Amino acid sequence: MNQKAVILDEQAIRRALTRIAHEMIERNKGMNNCILVGIKTRGIYLAKRLAERIEQIEGNPVTVGEIDITLYRDDLSKKTSNDEPLVKGADIPVDITDQKVILVDDVLYTGRTVRAGMDALVDVGRPSSIQLAVLVDRGHRELPIRADYIGKNIPTSKSEKVMVQLDEVDQNDLVAIYENE
């Protein structure tokens, strides 16, 4: 794959997350009864970064959980090498029933990952609402899903790939578009 363009560098990612944190606080009139839940892998780190920013702004900690949606994906025909579904589940430290859950992911594309995330959340509890925050929305939805908080809208073609790199995983903060060869 050839890198076509850098969309967000470290500073732009930091700014986008700070703006999203402010939008969350404003929309929810504070963050009481709100839980951030990151979708594995990069969504977890984005949720943690958002929680840090919200705590800096509001002065109160925000609960962060994580979910692994592998079992819930409808577009993965084989989950493991022996054809058994891979069950990871959720690690959410509090009951989400009657709480506002903000699902956090890195890239919104077809909507299938988010749908799987919502399925996983409903298996854990019944939140009063589910909101969606993404660092990048690249379009090309296959399901009627829309993000409530978006770091950056990036129009792409289906032949392009948007890659998010985060320091916690990739030792670098960067969002770039790559062209498939």
From Swiss-Prot:
Pfam family, one: Pribosyltran
Classification via SUPFAM superfamilies: PRTase-like
Motif (PRPP-binding): 101-113
Annotated catalysed reactions: UMP + diphosphate = 5-phospho-alpha-D-ribose 1-diphosphate + uracil
Top-rank EC class of the record's enzyme: transferase
Mutagenesis or variant effect for R141Q: Loss of ability to regulate the pyr operon; highly reduced affinity for RNA; no effect on UPRTase activity
Effect of T41I: Reduced ability to regulate the pyr operon; reduced affinity for RNA; loss of UPRTase activity
pH dependence per the UniProt record: Optimum pH is 8.2 for UPRTase activity.
Key word Calcium present: no
GO biological process, one term: DNA-templated transcription termination
EC number, as in UniProt: 2.4.2.9
Single GO MF descriptor: RNA binding
Annotated family: Belongs to the purine/pyrimidine phosphoribosyltransferase family. PyrR subfamily.
Protein name (database record): Bifunctional protein PyrR
